[in-house]
């Protein structure tokens, strides 16, 4: 199995992924792990890989261009790209088994406030979360997944051992993040984030957060519940989706 890790902090991986079972697996050639520093694919002299979010708000957002350039520089063969995200599929042993069947895994580790939404749209096959809590970045989550998956790759534990025996804010998922450029490969930043109208921006973000949670982690809403105003926002979101569907021409069978 080949594993490529896109990160701003490759040094975080050197100890955990180069010791014990994982070290032996790499020495045997069963697993190959490469660390790609996203800053190496920036174009400015300061190697800036993040920028202020469109629409305002706290924190910085990781830029789309250096991540895509780093991704495109990786030789690929049946690759499967994972972005570590609190709004992703919950990681468990079943998912670890699925991933252990892949030939090539690519991990994208977020940091700061988040990653430009267009990264997910362009290259991500699966978003994965390791739990309902907040970490500084995706690096530790990637280590958890890599460790769990590697143990299931044939030959890693040895024939004598059977592997089979062996942030949330307000309980809602986050809204999509965007930063410069405004247009990337035809994917535009939502117009409302460029309006300067902070009331509209706040409503859009709350609506997207509610829709994200409903579609991806409905179990959180069942525990949390919804206010009357939040239900209205969701219905508005459904209406907007219906309008988009109506704009698509019918296809003759």
Swiss-Prot record:
It is found in: Cytoplasm. GO terms for biological process: tRNA N1-guanine methylation. It catalyses: guanosine(37) in tRNA + S-adenosyl-L-methionine = N(1)-methylguanosine(37) in tRNA + S-adenosyl-L-homocysteine + H(+). The keyword S-adenosyl-L-methionine applies. GO terms for cellular component: cytosol. One of its GO terms (molecular function) is tRNA (guanine(37)-N1)-methyltransferase activity. Pfam families: tRNA_m1G_MT. Its EC number is 2.1.1.228. It comes from the Bacteria. SUPFAM superfamilies: alpha/beta knot. S-adenosyl-L-methionine binds at residues 110, 130-135. The keyword tRNA processing applies. Keywords: Cytoplasm, Methyltransferase, S-adenosyl-L-methionine, Transferase, tRNA processing. Belongs to the RNA methyltransferase TrmD family. NCBIfam families: PRK00026.1 (NF000648), trmD (TIGR00088). Homodimer. Specifically methylates guanosine-37 in various tRNAs. This is tRNA (guanine-N(1)-)-methyltransferase. It comes from Carboxydothermus hydrogenoformans (strain ATCC BAA-161 / DSM 6008 / Z-2901). The lineage of its organism: Bacteria, Bacillati, Bacillota, Clostridia, Thermoanaerobacterales.
